[in-house]
Amino acid sequence: MQENYKAKAYDILKNLNIEEGDLIEIKKGDLRIRGILLPSYSKDERIFVIKLDNGYNIGISIDNISEIKLITKNSSKAQESERKEVSRNGAKSEIKIISTGGTIVSKVEYETGAVRPALTTEEIVQFLPEINEIAKVDAEVLFSILSENMKPEYWVKIAESVKKAFGEGNTGVVIAHGTDTMAYTASALAFSLRSLQGPVVLVGSQRSSDRPSSDSAINLLSAVTTAKYAPFGEVVVNMHADSSDTYALVHRGVKVRKMHSSRRDAFQSVNDKPLAKVLWKERKLVMLDKSYMSKKGETTLDAKFDNRAFLLYYYPGLDRDFLEHILTNTKIRGLIIAGTGLGHTSSDYVELFRKATKDGIFIGMTTQCLFGRVNMNVYTTGRQLLDAGVTPLEDMLPEVALVKLMWVLAHEQDLEKIRSLMISNLVGEINPRHTLDLFPRWSYE
């Protein structure tokens, strides 16, 4: 199929019996460029689009090309009719890809420069032909939103779609999601989906597919590899891990955080090790941690959230009246504090917290340090906060604690029952044992 190419480029491909998806080699001057021929959406009829071995896409002008050689035909062509059947019948797929937004599954419209989602199974396979080498996939666009617009009601819809996907016979689920709030959604799904039949893999892209340094292809291939081969039944985040494009890491969904605004390896496990490493070129999953939740027989759905919760990042000079207003003049049922150090705020607020907990409002303490756990028994202020009813939340990340609280509030009304659930390790959100290697050390040599 050369239908996306025109004029001279089309004639060259037709004469050589080269089709989209074939592995070819182009000689231009002293350069030899090898890669998979992709569809071209450019108005320039002299451009070939090639996917390199490192996952990047490049455009090559036909001008001054001395040789074009077919290396191997597209191995997925033989699977084309089967793939079309898969797209019509999700039950025949192995891996379900659910798109919620972001640029991880997208295609460039070169006429406008715009990037739009690849909406169908065929488009995803066209975008990434290698995916057929891993598993049969079926794609669904649940919604297409910017991740900063994610809401608890959307978490419920995603969880329902995951449950449905497993019910259709899929053995793993990949969720395409914007990176900014991916960790929140991962936590929400972890609390909402229990006894998972297989992996639920959230994946995103830090750089869209129209950029030469895009991580879209590597991340999606890695995510499908994880969904196909992982032995666990957990919600995880699968993202790029190194600047050399050699592997991706699989992070437990309740122990991961986006730690850089733009780097491709922005996601890091916090107070925990990654569960696995994905060698995407080899289509291989290497387990790094054996303490995972095994796959179960049938997935249980329990997706309810009460968003009458608030995440407070404490800072010196926090206005007492402002805090009092939040605790007394709103519908708030729970407060998560990102406190300093071992879990502190100014002692000026102790009595406010005491009154709030007596009124049935849950107050939980996490640390702004992120790494390490809270220990409110060490210093006087911490002990005062404990006496006022503030609950220490071990090594939980502030965002995870917030999502967990929303889930707990939707299930319990009694403060003591809420406290009991919040300090219980439900899905691996609390790591009872920290080792020295859990803290990253930066080298300045």
From Swiss-Prot:
Keywords: ATP-binding, Ligase, Nucleotide-binding, Protein biosynthesis. Its EC number is 6.3.5.-. InterPro entries: AsnA_fam, Asp/glu_Ase-like_sf, Asparaginase/glutaminase-like, Asparaginase/glutaminase_AS2, Asparaginase_C, GatD, GatD_N, GatD_N_sf. Pfam families: Asparaginase, Asparaginase_C, GatD_N. The active site is at T103, T179, D180, K258. One of its GO terms (biological process) is regulation of translational fidelity. One of its GO terms (molecular function) is glutaminyl-tRNA synthase (glutamine-hydrolyzing) activity. Residues 93-425 form the Asparaginase/glutaminase domain. It catalyses: L-glutamyl-tRNA(Gln) + L-glutamine + ATP + H2O = L-glutaminyl-tRNA(Gln) + L-glutamate + ADP + phosphate + H(+). Heterodimer of GatD and GatE. PANTHER family: 60 KDA LYSOPHOSPHOLIPASE (PTHR11707:SF28), L-ASPARAGINASE (PTHR11707). HAMAP family: GatD (MF_00586). Allows the formation of correctly charged Gln-tRNA(Gln) through the transamidation of misacylated Glu-tRNA(Gln) in organisms which lack glutaminyl-tRNA synthetase. The reaction takes place in the presence of glutamine and ATP through an activated gamma-phospho-Glu-tRNA(Gln). The GatDE system is specific for glutamate and does not act on aspartate. Belongs to the asparaginase 1 family. GatD subfamily. This is Glutamyl-tRNA(Gln) amidotransferase subunit D. The lineage of its organism: Archaea, Thermoproteota, Thermoprotei, Sulfolobales, Sulfolobaceae. The gene is gatD.
